[in-house]
Amino acid sequence: MDTPLRRSRRLGGLRPECPESLTSVSRTRRALVELESNPEETREPGSPPSVQRAGLGSPERPPKTSPGSPRLQQGSGLESPQGQPEPGAGSPQRQQDLHLESPQRQPEYSPESPRCQPKPSEEVPKCSQDQGVLASELAQSKEELTPGAPQHQLPPVPGSPEPYPGQQAPGPEPSQPLLELTPRAPGSPRGQHEPSKPPPAGETVTGGFGAKKRKGSSSLAPASKKLNKEELPVIPKGKPKSGRVWKDRSKKRFSQMLQDKPLRTSWQRKMKERQERKLAKDFARHLEEEKERRRQEKKQRRAENLKRRLENERKAEVVQVIRNPAKLKRAKKKQLRSIEKRDTLALLQKQPPQRPAAKI
């Protein structure tokens, strides 16, 4: 088993980027397994071993690699054409320093120029420690989808001082945002999307989905309300406080029952009803008074009629004045009943003196 110390000896004294990554033995082991499983490696005769094994032999793993660094781009997959390590000034040590300590991002390419150019004499790129075997398998599956994608380039040999077309002169640059890790076909512009992913629907698709959602929401609204009503759990009522489980819960005290209040009437209607009641009372009193008046009139008329009849009878009667009291003594009881005492002075004054007739 190769340890980070032994591997650093064999690589010829490469300087690690960060001492914290020396403990990641498992990740370096994965990178070695990936390298051994790749039979397409070829070495260039003129390049020193340190340059050829620059991407593999570094035992360090940066804790947080910038999104645009070639290490992250190498770990993205075998077919990833996004980043290339820049060629050095001419010495192997300079190339090692550029590859290990100063990772640089690649410049923005025009849509006409491919992302990177393949080189038949170069070896297949290695998987970095940060991605591992899972990232390599994912990259291989994506590479099968796009067979025409160019391979990642390694640093050129020290004898070639000229950079490749599309590359930038070495120098520290700020890291760019994370780029797409899926392969691109050569000649495909930067703005195009991958073939493995479906193209975005755009406004038309989103609008259509929103329209479908709006149409479906109106139809599902009553159904959702019904479901909510049906889903409400039936909570059983507990034992009454009094302990009477047979107690009828519908029965309540009269004070607890809700009583309907009488309908409120307007002020005008109240005054109208009061006036009507007053008129009814007045009319009833008037009727009683009228009835009493008629009764009194009838009584008075009756009395007057009786008095007038008596007077008429007296006027029409024939009387005999008894001037001899001895006759009264000899008269019988039956005769005495018909005899009356009356005041005859008024009659004598009104009428001329007549000869009185004796009653038999």
UniProtKB/Swiss-Prot annotation:
<feature type="compositionally biased region" description="Basic residues">
    <location>
        <begin position="238"/>
        <end position="254"/>
    </location>
</feature>
<feature type="modified residue" description="Phosphoserine">
    <location>
        <position position="69"/>
    </location>
</feature>
<keyword id="KW-0164">Citrullination</keyword>
<feature type="modified residue" description="Phosphothreonine">
    <location>
        <position position="65"/>
    </location>
</feature>
<feature type="modified residue" description="Phosphoserine">
    <location>
        <position position="50"/>
    </location>
</feature>
<keyword id="KW-0158">Chromosome</keyword>
<feature type="compositionally biased region" description="Basic and acidic residues">
    <location>
        <begin position="302"/>
        <end position="314"/>
    </location>
</feature>
<feature type="region of interest" description="Disordered">
    <location>
        <begin position="1"/>
        <end position="314"/>
    </location>
</feature>
<feature type="modified residue" description="Citrulline">
    <location>
        <position position="342"/>
    </location>
</feature>
<feature type="modified residue" description="Phosphoserine">
    <location>
        <position position="21"/>
    </location>
</feature>
<feature type="modified residue" description="Phosphoserine">
    <location>
        <position position="102"/>
    </location>
</feature>
<feature type="modified residue" description="Phosphoserine">
    <location>
        <position position="217"/>
    </location>
</feature>
<feature type="compositionally biased region" description="Pro residues">
    <location>
        <begin position="153"/>
        <end position="164"/>
    </location>
</feature>
<feature type="modified residue" description="Phosphoserine">
    <location>
        <position position="80"/>
    </location>
</feature>
<feature type="modified residue" description="Phosphoserine">
    <location>
        <position position="58"/>
    </location>
</feature>
<protein>
    <recommendedName>
        <fullName>Coiled-coil domain-containing protein 86</fullName>
    </recommendedName>
</protein>
<feature type="modified residue" description="Phosphoserine">
    <location>
        <position position="113"/>
    </location>
</feature>
<feature type="modified residue" description="Phosphoserine">
    <location>
        <position position="47"/>
    </location>
</feature>
<feature type="modified residue" description="Phosphoserine">
    <location>
        <position position="91"/>
    </location>
</feature>
<feature type="modified residue" description="Phosphoserine">
    <location>
        <position position="188"/>
    </location>
</feature>
<dbReference type="InterPro" id="IPR026570">
    <property type="entry name" value="CCDC86"/>
</dbReference>
<feature type="modified residue" description="Phosphoserine">
    <location>
        <position position="218"/>
    </location>
</feature>
<feature type="modified residue" description="Phosphoserine">
    <location>
        <position position="24"/>
    </location>
</feature>
<keyword id="KW-0175">Coiled coil</keyword>
<feature type="coiled-coil region">
    <location>
        <begin position="272"/>
        <end position="323"/>
    </location>
</feature>
<feature type="compositionally biased region" description="Basic and acidic residues">
    <location>
        <begin position="273"/>
        <end position="295"/>
    </location>
</feature>
<dbReference type="InterPro" id="IPR005579">
    <property type="entry name" value="Cgr1-like"/>
</dbReference>
<keyword id="KW-0539">Nucleus</keyword>
<feature type="region of interest" description="Disordered">
    <location>
        <begin position="328"/>
        <end position="360"/>
    </location>
</feature>
<feature type="modified residue" description="Phosphoserine">
    <location>
        <position position="128"/>
    </location>
</feature>
<feature type="compositionally biased region" description="Polar residues">
    <location>
        <begin position="66"/>
        <end position="83"/>
    </location>
</feature>
<feature type="compositionally biased region" description="Basic residues">
    <location>
        <begin position="1"/>
        <end position="12"/>
    </location>
</feature>
<comment type="function">
    <text>Required for proper chromosome segregation during mitosis and error-free mitotic progression.</text>
</comment>
<feature type="modified residue" description="Phosphoserine">
    <location>
        <position position="110"/>
    </location>
</feature>
<feature type="modified residue" description="Phosphoserine">
    <location>
        <position position="66"/>
    </location>
</feature>
<keyword id="KW-0597">Phosphoprotein</keyword>
<dbReference type="GO" id="GO:0005730">
    <property type="term" value="C:nucleolus"/>
</dbReference>
<dbReference type="Pfam" id="PF03879">
    <property type="entry name" value="Cgr1"/>
</dbReference>
